[in-house]
């Protein structure tokens, strides 16, 4: 806050000097008026716009210096026209100062930042490690189809908004904000908006979280805080929790995007010691106790005024406003994302464009590569990665590989796997699947998974609304390898059959696609979040999964029962069942 006040005072002094008139009888009146107006105007502007107050690498301070110079120039021009002719030479000299400042600022910024002069530095912002295709299965572990992300952001936000619509007293003053995906762990006691007390348990579960926000200035003025947040499972659209109490204490979220004055989250950070820091990517996350925080990326430019690199994060308590700053290596384990996707997309493009210099990137474009549109989150063993396809410049549907970038550390791996990009995968399903075409379904943005060692796009399908109407799998390596069905389990079964019958590449070593029924004895069975986990006497060291949506008999399964099952035998520790039937069982 001090920086904003001091700089507004500095601008006021400039205006006062420009307005000063030695010949006037009231020579102090005009400077005081001009300086006071300047101080108030720029003070309010600073508090509203919150520029980054750092001389090098950020535009905010330079822009305000230029504005101050122009402000002085305007006063100077007025006095040159109406003032004492004897002072005109002084005013002309004063006019040269703001013009010189503007030109100097422009030259310094361009010279220190332009890709033409710093192409090598831009190309080295991201340093991917090229790894063999065969290592993909080791780096990205397969997960059960029931744990794949089937609820997109827009769908999660719609589900949450419908929940609050059923509460008129709350819905009239609040609404849910932007949903952020996190990998949630922990067990904590909550009370929901419906008054239900329960204990929630999450084990590396992907969920969408969103805070309750104010509906405008007057709602903030009346209430100051909101009553909680919403959790929506990214796997199961029926698993929604509107949390208003945590461990017996009512939630009161104060520092929000919809807050005003000092309660607005960015202004709160800027006015509490972080005016000179680059801040971006305000994401909501929960710790292992369900406590809500803002996780904000701290960054600094590495090439003049560009080449932004994340250096750490701020963790802000959404209730108390307490701010903790962490370096990347010291951030709490529950923090998922520090690296903003917008930074990484720029760095991927810079890496792909400037490997052979700026001139080649602009003209010949030999070997120039770029990121495919958009990025998506990929999860493996509790860690999250940004996924981006890599394609040759100007390519529409093909990709020459893909990158996985750790969302905390920026560790980057490049898989040089030729195939199709995300847009092409969507078009394959919409155009080549007869069921999808006849149903007039649209494919949503895909997420990359390891399906028995094969890099595979998984996507949801929607009809007229945003509710899921189907599910699809498409191989990254071949547009001929795809399947779509009404449930994820059926789509996966069809996809595995397609791979088995017409694969143009080998399934990862040790994977055997077998559909024959195998007789097993149930050693143990538990249900967690709608997914059944089963152990068999005949198979040690592995657990099998399924849902009652795919196999209704699972709800009646007990220990020591004999069952017929089929599955794809892989090296994974958790395997999805392809079929399940209890022997001699009748309802």
Regions found by a protein language model. Give the residues of each.
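Soluble extracytoplasmic regions of secretory-pathway and membrane proteins
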Residues: 4-587
């Amino acid at each position: 806050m001090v920086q904003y006040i001091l700089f507004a005072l500095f601008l006021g002094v400039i205006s006062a000097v420009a307005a000063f008139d030695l010949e006037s009888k009231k020579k102090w009146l005009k400077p005081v008026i001009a300086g006071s107006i300047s101080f108030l105007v720029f003070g309010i502007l600073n508090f509203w716009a919150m520029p980054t107050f750092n001389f090098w690498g950020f535009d905010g301070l330079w822009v305000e210096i230029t504005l101050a110079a122009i402000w002085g120039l305007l006063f100077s021009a007025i006095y040159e026209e109406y003032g004492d002719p004897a002072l005109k030479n002084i005013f002309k000299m004063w006019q040269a100062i703001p013009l010189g400042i503007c030109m100097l600022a422009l030259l310094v910024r361009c010279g220190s930042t332009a890709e033409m002069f710093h192409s090598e530095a831009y190309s080295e912002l991201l340093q991917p490690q090229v790894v063999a295709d065969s290592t993909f299965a080791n780096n990205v572990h397969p997960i059960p189809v029931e744990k794949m992300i089937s609820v997109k952001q827009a769908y999660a936000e719609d589900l949450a908004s419908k929940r609050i619509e059923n509460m008129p007293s709350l819905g009239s003053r609040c609404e849910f904000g932007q949903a952020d995906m996190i990998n949630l762990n922990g067990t904590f006691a909550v009370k929901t908006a419906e008054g239900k007390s329960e204990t929630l348990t999450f084990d590396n579960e992907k969920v969408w979280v969103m805070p309750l926000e104010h509906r405008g200035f007057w709602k903030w003025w009346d209430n100051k805080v909101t009553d909680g947040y919403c959790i929506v499972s990214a796997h199961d659209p029926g698993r929604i929790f509107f949390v208003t109490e945590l461990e017996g204490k009512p939630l009161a979220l104060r520092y929000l995007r919809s807050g005003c004055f000092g309660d607005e989250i960015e202004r709160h950070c800027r006015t509490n010691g972080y005016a000179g820091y680059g801040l971006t990517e305000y994401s909501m996350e929960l710790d292992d106790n369900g406590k809500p925080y803002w996780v904000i990326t701290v960054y600094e430019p590495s090439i003049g005024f560009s080449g932004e690199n994340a250096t750490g994060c701020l963790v802000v308590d959404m209730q108390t406003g307490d701010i903790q700053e962490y370096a990347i290596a010291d951030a709490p384990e529950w923090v998922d994302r520090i690296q903003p996707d917008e930074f990484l997309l720029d760095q991927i493009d810079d890496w792909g464009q400037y490997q052979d210099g700026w001139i080649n990137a602009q003209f010949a474009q030999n070997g120039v590569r770029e990121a495919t549109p958009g990025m998506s989150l990929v999860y493996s063993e509790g860690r999250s990665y940004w996924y981006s396809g890599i394609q040759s410049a100007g390519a529409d549907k093909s990709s020459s590989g893909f990158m996985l970038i750790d969302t905390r550390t920026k560790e980057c791996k490049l898989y040089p796997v030729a195939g199709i990009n995300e847009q092409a995968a969507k078009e394959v399903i919409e155009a080549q699947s007869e069921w999808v075409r006849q149903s007039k379904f649209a494919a949503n943005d895909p997420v990359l998974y390891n399906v028995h060692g094969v890099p595979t796009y998984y996507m949801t399908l929607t009809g007229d609304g945003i509710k899921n109407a189907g599910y699809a799998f498409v191989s990254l390596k071949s547009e001929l390898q795809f399947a779509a069905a009404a449930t994820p389990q059926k789509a996966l079964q069809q996809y595995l059959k397609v791979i088995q019958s017409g694969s143009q590449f080998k399934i990862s070593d040790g994977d055997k696609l077998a559909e024959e029924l195998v007789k097993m004895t149930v050693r143990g069975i538990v249900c967690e979040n709608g997914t059944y986990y089963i152990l068999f006497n005949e198979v040690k060291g592995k657990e099998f999964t399924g849902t009652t949506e795919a196999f209704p008999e699972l709800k009646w399964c007990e220990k020591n029962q004999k069952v017929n099952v089929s599955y794809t035998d892989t090296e994974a520790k958790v395997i999805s069942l392809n079929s399940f039937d209890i022997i001699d069982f009748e309802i």
